[in-house]
């Protein structure tokens, strides 16, 4: 006589436990960083960031608040508080760049990085940060990009700079960097983004002007 084998049917509590274990085993998904193709689209051609930047070299350093706007290839960078100058403004496009100080001096050049270095004495890779802050290398230049096992951006190296990404923010279905560290030789630059804005900037931001020093 054959004894039928018992048939096991999991109860509702066992099913709930299985679902909970499955959820714990699956890490939360993070949106992909933008690609060079994404940034070339009209959807991402206008953007703005507000945040803070600091530079440290040896026992010297400075920090400033930052407001950076880009409109279809034209950019404007306002730095408030660097080097005791009150504020500086940098405006540029493919044709060149103009730097204005709080005391009314204007400087014009073809290269933004060289102009900032000549006026302030500090090396700030403006041309690179325009792309690195969006999580992509500068087009047309050799770069080494590192991602984690899930394909998320971890770091990139380009033009003598090493860029480490520590934090991202989901905006419009993409992961945009909000904390990054740039190093070259003995210089360290830290950039913290408090606000990412995609599309046309609000009028209040557009009217932010370089302020003159107090008498």
Please tell me what each predicted stretch does.
Residues 1-24:
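Sec-dependent bacterial lipoprotein signal peptides
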Residues 20-40:
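Bacterial Sec signal peptide processing site at the extreme N-terminus
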Residues 42-76, 80, 87:
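Post-signal-peptide N-terminal segment of Sec-exported extracytoplasmic proteins
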Residues 45, 64, 73, 86, ...:
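Envelope-exposed proteins and targeting segments
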Residues 66-69, 90-92, 166-170:
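Extended lipid/amphipathic-ligand handling interfaces
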Residues 74-124:
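An acidic-aromatic
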Residues 135-215:
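Gly/Pro-enriched, hydrophobic low-complexity segments
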């Amino acid at each position: 006589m054959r004894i039928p084998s018992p048939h096991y049917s999991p109860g509702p509590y066992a099913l709930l436990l299985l679902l909970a274990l499955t959820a714990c085993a699956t890490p939360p998904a993070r949106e992909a960083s933008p690609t060079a193709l994404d940034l070339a689209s009209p959807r991402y051609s206008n953007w703005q960031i507000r945040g803070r930047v600091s530079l440290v070299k040896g026992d010297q350093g400075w920090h400033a608040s930052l407001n950076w706007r880009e409109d279809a290839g034209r950019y404007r960078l306002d730095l408030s508080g660097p080097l005791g100058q009150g504020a500086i403004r940098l405006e540029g496009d493919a044709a060149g760049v103009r730097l204005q100080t709080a005391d009314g001096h204007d400087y014009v050049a073809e290269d933004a990085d060289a102009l900032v270095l000549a006026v302030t004495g500090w090396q700030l890779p403006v041309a690179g940060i325009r792309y690195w802050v969006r999580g992509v290398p500068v087009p047309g230049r050799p770069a080494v990009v590192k991602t984690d096992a899930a394909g998320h951006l971890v770091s990139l190296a380009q033009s003598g700079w090493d860029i480490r990404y520590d934090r991202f923010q989901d905006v419009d279905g993409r992961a945009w960097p909000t904390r990054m560290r740039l190093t070259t030789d003995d210089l360290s630059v830290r950039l913290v983004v408090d606000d990412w804005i995609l599309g046309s900037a609000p009028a209040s931001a557009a009217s932010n002007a370089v302020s003159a020093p107090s008498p």
